[in-house]
Amino acid sequence: MKLKDFFTPDTVKLHLEGESKDEILKELIAVLRLDEKSQAILYKTVKRRENLGSTGIGKGIAIPHCRSLVVNRLRLAYGRKPEGIDFKAIDGQPVYHFFLIVAPPLEVSNQYLPVLGKIAQFAKDPDVPRKLQEIDAEEAFLELLEAKAV
């Protein structure tokens, strides 16, 4: 299982426009291309998870994640906010890179936690935040995942 396999150019958005945590979450959810009702349900679920504690893990990266009935398989999206926003990250720094993970409540493949772990491992690489900022096309994001062999 490689992270690259969970993304397509359509699930990568390099110029998030939101100016707040809520706007960014809604924009990331929209990348998954769910119907309007499902997006609203998913937003409430992600927001509830975020209220338990920020998913901003530091170094400019956040991994909002949850389980929800609105998906029938693991779904991921990546978004970048070049200017960064206050996401209440654990290091107190702005967040520029967002990895959204949504899994169904009962996931037969059990990929949710391993994928979450792989993204956290990817984020720990000291070069990753800089390389993510330098990406100029969605395909380059996929190439970076491949190059880092996660």
Model-predicted segments: where are they?
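Cytosolic covalent-transfer regions centered on His/Cys nucleophiles
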Residues: 1-150
